Amino acid sequence: DRAKTALGGIADAIAWPATLLSSAGFIDDPWALVKLRGKIAGEELAQSLLDGQHGHRPVTFVAYSAGAYVVQSCLQKLYEAGDRGKNIVDRAIFISAPISTSKDVWQPMREVVSGRLVNVHCHTDWILLLMWRFNMLDPMTRLAGLSIVKRVPSVENYNIKNLRHAHLPDEISRVLEEIDLQE
């Protein structure tokens, strides 16, 4: 009987983490798909903005959670377009964004957003933290939705306490009011 041997105790100790790791696969694949689709959607959005389909009005983006992939990808494509990509986006607000805080990510966005570039974070957003830990290969990368963007000084950082990731759609008005963007 396995339970009566020393190996049984070891097997039982390994079985629980192994079960967790194998069940984490259901999170990983959809998350990678969300990132990929966000990148593609952002590139398409950038192209439509470059084509002038928005008219001659300034654009404001408010992106939360995985929607940040779309906006970040769009802003990156606008940056790659050089001068053509500038003066299209007036403001970009990222709320609980699962993107890196690195200068490589935020500096290009800063260069194409003519007005406010805002990172709204909450260090106690456990849902975002859990999703990040299951899907992030580099544990040294800081996540914008959980911390401040330090290396691009003109990025506004707001720590919104008690931001509930699961209820973000209901929280948007409150967040926009707290960062003085409600119009």
Q: Where are each of the predicted segments found?
A:
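Gly/Ala-rich beta-loop-alpha elbow adjacent to hydrolase catalytic centers
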Residues: 63-67, 71
